[in-house]
Design a protein with these regions (language model features):
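N-terminal non-catalytic cap/leader segment that marks the start of a structured domain
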Residues: 8, 22-102, 125, 195-199, ...
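RNA pseudouridine synthases
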Residues: 135-138, 144-160
């Protein structure tokens, strides 16, 4: 699957060179990866990763060491302690009222998997649907923040696929099994700063065919509203993720299907479904 991974990143390879700048005044791509048995962070420039001495969200600097992209396994781009999600956030999918609180649910850190990885379905998961989504990644502790200040607490963006078992979703009391099963939260390929969360194009493909495509400007509950609302009830910590909802129609996946989620400026998240 590594060929999917590399081509997806290069397709939209925006990168700011030079010293790392956590002020987010430029577009920069950060990746989290496994290499030679170790987990690290780096800045992606084309097919080269410049290794960092720590997590860019909490503070890091380049080490000067470079690593070839095709020699690493890309992991979820942050070490998320909490994974929130918004439902019914596009009228083209299922809409909710803009003057009401955003509908929320949780995924689990163990739901997360990186680009290029296979998603192995439980044997009784027979109605799993793709849901391509924009994902916010929190940059600093947030509690009771205003909507006006909320985006100051977002470090950057990535792409996600909120895989969902529709039969379980309709039958179970809670959505935990349907939404938070291991592997049901692919994210990546990179954590990107400097993008406008309210204006990026999201495209989902199933086996190369476009099945979802919409601009995030059409989100009903905007990122600032969601971050502010969540922070009333939950402490948001650096690295936490917020899935922002899916547009359009979804459909069930079969063994061997390849789902890609492309967001302009971020790149392409690619995963294969395996039974």
């Amino acid at each position: 699957m590594r060929s999917f991974l590399i081509s997806g990143i290069l397709a939209l390879g925006l990168m700011a060179t030079g010293p790392i700048a956590l002020a987010q005044d430029a577009t920069t791509k950060y990746v989290r990866f496994s290499h030679d048995g170790r987990t690290g962070f780096g800045i992606l420039d084309g097919t080269t990763i410049t290794a960092l001495d720590g997590d860019p969200i909490t503070g890091a600097k380049p080490t000067g060491k470079t690593i070839a992209l095709d020699s690493v396994e890309l992991l979820p781009p942050s070490d998320a302690g909490k994974v929130f999600a918004v439902g019914m956030n596009f009228a083209s999918h299922i809409s909710s009222a803009s003057d009401r609180p955003p509908p929320l649910f949780l995924k689990l850190p163990t739901s997360l998997t990186g680009t290029g990885s296979d998603v192995s379905l439980p044997p009784d998961a027979n109605n799993v649907h793709f849901e391509g989504e924009l994902v916010l990644i929190i940059g600093k502790r947030a509690r009771n923040v205003s909507e006006a200040d909320a985006m100051d607490y977002v470090f950057g963006l990535t792409a996600g696929n909120d895989l969902t078992e529709r039969s379980w979703q309709g039958r179970d009391l809670q959505w935990m099994r349907a939404k938070a099963t291991d592997g049901f939260g692919p994210v990546g390929p990179a954590l990107v700063t400097g993008l406008d969360a309210n204006n990026v194009l999201l495209t989902t493909r199933l086996n190369g065919e476009i099945v979802q495509q919409e601009n995030t400007r059409n989100m009903i509950h905007k990122p600032a509203k969601v971050v502010s609302y969540l922070s009333r009830y939950f402490t948001l910590s650096p690295g936490d993720m917020i899935f922002m909802g899916t547009p359009g129609r979804t459909s069930a996946l079969d063994d061997g299907d390849v789902v890609t989620v492309t967001i302009e400026g971020i790149g392409t998240l690619t995963n294969r479904i395996v039974r």
